[in-house]
Amino acid sequence: LQRTKIDDVTLERFIVGPLEVNCYLLTTEDSAILIDPGFAADELRKRVESLNHLESRMILLTHGHFDHTGFCPELVKNGWKAGIHPDDKLLLNRVPPDFEGLGYRDEPFESYVTFKEGWNFNIGGISLNLIHTPGHSPGSVCFIERKRRWAFTGDTLFADSIGRSDLPGGDEQTLMQSLEKLKGVLEPETLVLSGHGGCALFNTILRINPFLQD
């Protein structure tokens, strides 16, 4: 997936940063949502600049790891609002020493809103439901767009694998519980749009992902 449109909502994917994070941009005629902006590549930066005239511009973070949040300080300075689960606030843009050589910068920012389990975000015909899925990090979440059957799963669930649970704040048992939770809420034809790698329908993931086998 690079770009698709359903009804009046356009969905675009940008692969950004040395760790190749999937950043998703949802736009309508008068609004924009960025999910996990990562560290901006030139293509993403140009696209974002073209949206500065929109009245509603929101960043939604699936979790607080630096590779998913690095573009946030610049975006917030330019009028975007950012949202994150409160359990990941302390992670925001804090770069572990092992990754500093890749060009990541430690640039924490304080301007954000927080959201919790069951939160619903409605803007410009887009309706996203938040599911708290800790395990990769304490505040990891997924955003579900039920009308168009999109699920933005961050680093909780990939097409053929799952996120790491050995990072600070991660927990393997909690992650497995979160995966069971997703199995109970995602419809088979939902397109899973993860934080890294390719996209796949959930019914395909149930067949090929060894971590979701009963």
Where are these regions (language model features)?
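Metallo-beta-lactamase
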Residues: 32, 98, 127-214
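Conserved beta-strand segments of alpha/beta enzyme cores
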Residues: 10-12, 81, 113, 127-129, ...
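Short Gly/Pro-enriched turn/cap motifs at secondary-structure boundaries
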Residues: 14-16, 110-113, 132-134
